[in-house]
From Swiss-Prot:
Keywords: Glycosyltransferase, Nucleotide-binding, Transferase. One of its GO terms (molecular function) is nucleotide binding. It catalyses: (S)-malate + UDP-N-acetyl-alpha-D-glucosamine = (S)-malyl N-acetyl-alpha-D-glucosaminide + UDP + H(+). This is N-acetyl-alpha-D-glucosaminyl L-malate synthase. Involved in bacillithiol (BSH) biosynthesis. Catalyzes the first step of the pathway, the formation of N-acetylglucosaminylmalate (GlcNAc-Mal) from UDP-N-acetylglucosamine (UDP-GlcNAc) and L-malate. The keyword Transferase applies. The gene is bshA. The lineage of its organism: Bacteria, Bacillati, Bacillota, Bacilli, Bacillales. It comes from Bacillus anthracis. Disruption phenotype: Mutant does not produce bacillithiol. Its EC number is 2.4.1.-. InterPro entries: Glyco_trans_1 (IPR001296), Glyco_trans_4-like_N (IPR028098), Glycosyltransferase_grp1 (IPR050194), Thiol_BshA (IPR023881). PANTHER family: SULFOQUINOVOSYL TRANSFERASE SQD2 (PTHR45947:SF3). SUPFAM superfamilies: UDP-Glycosyltransferase/glycogen phosphorylase (SSF53756). Dimer of tetramers.
Amino acid sequence: MKLKIGITCYPSVGGSGVVGTELGKQLAERGHEIHFITSGLPFRLNKVYPNIYFHEVTVNQYSVFQYPPYDLALASKMAEVAQRENLDILHVHYAIPHAICAYLAKQMIGERIKIVTTLHGTDITVLGSDPSLNNLIRFGIEQSDVVTAVSHSLINETHELVKPNKDIQTVYNFIDERVYFKRDMTQLKKEYGISESEKILIHISNFRKVKRVQDVVQAFAKIVTEVDAKLLLVGDGPEFCTILQLVKNLHIEDRVLFLGKQDNVAELLAMSDLMLLLSEKESFGLVLLEAMACGVPCIGTRVGGIPEVIQHGDTGYLCEVGDTTGVADQAIQLLKDEELHRNMGERARESVYEQFRSEKIVSQYETIYYDVLRDDKNGKI
């Protein structure tokens, strides 16, 4: 049975927006009718896709409201689209505001549409720590028909911080193997002025404090004393200027390339030798999957969902938050040992295929959809 599914996510380059959009694209390929209900066109919807429809949430400014009422506009648009298109499911990414908006939409139309909510991290680890929002998050979770989270770690944090009376299933993030794969990037290296002998380290993030980009730079400054290497810093955000100054202070400007925001990073990853993700909080770490699919070993911090992605000593290394010396030592060992690097990169690719391939994860979501729609009495959808 083909389903009609509404998907709401942030249309930006963050992990939740990427996963929500890629999930919709994969479901559409399977013949389901997908309706994106978002404040802007998701950046991964960069062409016309069969079975995919976009409904923009327009937020008007009224003098009676101190701030533009995004939540109300979204709930209204959800109800409108769900009723007109006869949607079976609203799949929302983030407990607040999206699960709350879905609940309001369901109450407005009075129909038996099902709500699936996926927790991604910030909605729990940051917002869940705010006492003024805690009850609201719990309500959004408990009013959803099914709740998933992107890691076991996030489920544990949800129960610890929010304490919902709700079962939560782990459904890992995934990547499209047709986009992220190992390939020869010799020409691209030349275009960036990187020689064949130089190793390439890469970090991709939104440059917020929680990502600890300064640790990436500090570790790299130690690494280049032993290894001829370049560091690609991909992204932008509040800490960008601070990191720029740090690079200057460490006198490694000629070793670091600031590439800014990049919508499509697959080629940059395929060109790289090592990924560094040294966050102090990370519910999953989608960029790790993207790198591993390209045969790139990763070094990550032992926090949140990262240990569920990186198998220490097998597909990469884990370190403690702030241990830049440990990161540097592991990186130097790996980059100097060609056989170790090659074997670890291959095992990283195999791990992605075994645990995080799109076919497997999208099928898990399909099963969730069918189960939640199944009639308890006669077993029919």
